């Protein structure tokens, strides 16, 4: 029997962080193959239609994209199911708007507007560093980029600052204690803090202890940590909440205080 790639995705099987309601249809957009995994990405159609409300349906999204108005990391994208992901910069030429895809404290992609100056670069986590053919050194980033002849000081888990116009590495941050990080997986997804301690476990996962702005400490796996800045200073602007997770009672008190001011 002939088999092939799956071309459909049921709405109930779509990732929770897309925030699609179950009763609006049977199917959800199936992400195209691309730089981010299907469970960790946000298709362009979901971003433009469901988040920004720039379109009412898929046909309108395709009409916008075919006018070549939308850029992802400085490149025009016309595929409505193109998988955008963490740290990607989405630009809308006609309105002059720029967005960076980052997580909120509940682990969902948030609509985070940035300036035109900040849209010129993105941060990439180094996943692999090795020698290629004829001894040419190269590194591979979290979004599938291969960069040849990097700085020899750059190691795995470091973060590079990539210029989107020249595709050159401008600078890099070492993965070390006191570096500022954002958690990109697990139950603490979206939280921002400073690395306090690193636990080494042979044959198992390395554990990173992080302390947030309220001096609350939590732990996560090494693979879930993305360095976003040096001691006390982030290289990107952070969304509302600044990556600080509040307890249920603190959120309740905050809502009541805001309601009292209104």
From Swiss-Prot:
One of its GO terms (biological process) is translation. It is found in: Cytoplasm. It comes from the Eukaryota. Signal peptide: none annotated. Disulfide bonds: none annotated. Keywords: Cytoplasm, Phosphoprotein, Ribonucleoprotein, Ribosomal protein, RNA-binding, rRNA-binding. The modification Phosphothreonine is found at residue 194. Residues 42-105 form the S4 RNA-binding domain. InterPro entries: KOW, Rib_uL2_dom2, Ribosomal_eS4, Ribosomal_eS4_C, Ribosomal_eS4_central_region, Ribosomal_eS4_central_sf, Ribosomal_eS4_KOW, Ribosomal_eS4_N. One of its GO terms (molecular function) is structural constituent of ribosome. Transmembrane segments: none annotated. CDD domains: KOW_RPS4 (cd06087), S4 (cd00165). SMART domains: S4. One of its GO terms (cellular component) is cytosol. Component of the small ribosomal subunit (SSU). Mature yeast ribosomes consist of a small (40S) and a large (60S) subunit. The 40S small subunit contains 1 molecule of ribosomal RNA (18S rRNA) and at least 33 different proteins. The large 60S subunit contains 3 rRNA molecules (25S, 5.8S and 5S rRNA) and at least 46 different proteins. There are 3 genes for eS4 in S.pombe. Component of the ribosome, a large ribonucleoprotein complex responsible for the synthesis of proteins in the cell. The small ribosomal subunit (SSU) binds messenger RNAs (mRNAs) and translates the encoded message by selecting cognate aminoacyl-transfer RNA (tRNA) molecules. The large subunit (LSU) contains the ribosomal catalytic site termed the peptidyl transferase center (PTC), which catalyzes the formation of peptide bonds, thereby polymerizing the amino acids delivered by tRNAs into a polypeptide chain. HAMAP family: Ribosomal_eS4. Belongs to the eukaryotic ribosomal protein eS4 family. This is Small ribosomal subunit protein eS4C. It comes from Schizosaccharomyces pombe (strain 972 / ATCC 24843). The gene is rps403.
